Amino acid sequence: MKQTGPYISKNGADKSGFKNLAATHWNYRPAALYEEAIRRGEGHVAANGPFVVKTGVHTGRSAKDKFIVRDASTEKTVWWDNNKSMTPEAFDLLHADMLKHAEGKELFIQDLFGGADQTHRLATRIYTEYAWHSLFIQNLLIEPKPEELGSFDPQFTIIDLPSFEADPEKYGVRTGTVIACNFAKRIVLIAGTSYAGEIKKSVFSMLNYELPPKRVMPMHCSANVGEEGDTAIFFGLSGTGKTTLSAVATRTLIGDDEHGWSENGVFNFEGGCYAKMIKLSAEAEPEIYAVTRRFGTVLENVVMDENTRELDLDSAALAENSRGAYPLSFIPNASATGRAPHPKNIIMLTADAFSVLPPVARLTPSQAMYHFLSGYTAKVAGTEKGVTEPEATFSTCFGAPFMSRHPTEYGNLLRDLIAQHKVSCWLVNTGWTGGVYGTGNRMPIKATRALLAAALDGSLNNVEFRTDPNFGFEVPVDVPGVDNKILNPRETWADKAAYDAQAQKLVKMFIENFAKFEAHVDPDVRAAAPAAARAAE
């Protein structure tokens, strides 16, 4: 078998069960991966240098096709209400058939780390069928030092073969697409999808499973740190402003998506970013826009003019979920270490399209756990579907699809860390004010930034607060530089009775969603439920 590449590991592909491969390409650098991807017709080079690819029918994660092997080690540790199970026998059969499918093929191999904290990092080997997938994951994870690569010994293996179509009847899966996680063997198999985000999230799923027993909190969040070492964590679902609000010139960006919180502080799981590209502009997000004009960036499903090779970031012709994968080093004020001290502030972002929640609220540790387990935001349906009513979304831990263990395991760990390090917790609504979506207006970004700045510099703790009658958390009454009217959402509605009705509707949604956690949390967390609902009971 032919082996090429700058750093070929002594622990070869045969250790992972591969036989009769045509060639293995080890730890290729971006320029070489560009050449290989172009030679194979995998994509095109756009103007200014990024590599543009189409992922075909899969333009997002296939959440319904993800499985975890159910065995003696996972029977009582995995949250089976939220995760589909696969038998060990089905996994072994799928694994063997994928290894057989790889025979005669050329594979690209990257040896990388998941986690910037050396105590808790995961040495990960990724086998990919596509050269661009190899570039993608090199951009996203953390590259070892050259001296670490020759003897790299993987703790975790990902095998990514988009051309392998799974037989649902044979393997007990749903479609030809499958993401199969075997935590005991530390292997993930990805088949039947070209969407590269599955590779990145497989590492996150493994860390989400392995870290909590070590008292390390895995988090679906962005993070930044100020000059005084004051770290801030931003939890939030898609569309809440997690990436935008954490990327500010006055603070160093630790990362935009996945982090751990250990005894040593906060650390990025990754060495890159995977940002949405749709409608990206140089005016609104100059730092992210700049990476679309750089060699090394991978752009998924971004429309490109075939003649000029210029990008059309406004077009959703290929996908609404167009993405860019690039190294964190492409962002000017990004951390070189991916590490920061213990957080001083935790921000939980929500885009409340019901216009009930205030723009900012201060949370107790128990309230923080309640809202962390709730993971609330509201999606606004597309006009093409003719739906104008907002849709409430509750994604526990602000990342339910990636949570291998029961949410309360993460919630209890987070609450303990908040108490231990005396962290201030805030709920920030980046959604609507003055009425529901369609009637009210989007929360002014200027106001959100001013409130965040006050929270992070500590001055927000010194203003007068009132207790919200619906949710029981504390809301500032007067903040310098912010229109006081928007601080009280009820006052922004012309029809106060309509606000009260809408508030009770949202309160009821929270209560109904949290019912599944009631038996698993302490009385103080149950008591953090919306106040109006408790009074009505």
Curated annotation (Swiss-Prot):
Q: Where in the cell is it found?
A: Cytoplasm
Taxonomic lineage from the root: Bacteria, Pseudomonadati, Pseudomonadota, Alphaproteobacteria, Hyphomicrobiales
Catalytic reaction equation(s): oxaloacetate + ATP = phosphoenolpyruvate + ADP + CO2
Query: Where does this protein come from, organism-wise?
Result: Parvibaculum lavamentivorans (strain DS-1 / DSM 13023 / NCIMB 13966)
What positions does the entry give for ATP binding? K201, H220, G236, L237, S238, G239, T240, G241, K242, T243, T244, E285, R323, T448
- InterPro entries, from UniProt? PEP_carboxykinase_ATP, PEP_carboxykinase_C, PEP_carboxykinase_N, PEPCK_ATP_CS
- Give the main EC class: lyase
Going by the entry's taxonomy, the superkingdom of the source organism is recorded as Bacteria
Spell out the molecular function terms from Gene Ontology. Answer: ATP binding; metal ion binding; phosphoenolpyruvate carboxykinase (ATP) activity
Under which pathway is this protein filed?
Carbohydrate biosynthesis; gluconeogenesis
Q: What job does the chain carry out?
A: Involved in the gluconeogenesis. Catalyzes the conversion of oxaloacetate (OAA) to phosphoenolpyruvate (PEP) through direct phosphoryl transfer between the nucleoside triphosphate and OAA.
- State the name under which the record lists this protein: Phosphoenolpyruvate carboxykinase (ATP)
Q: Which cofactor does it need?
A: Mn(2+)
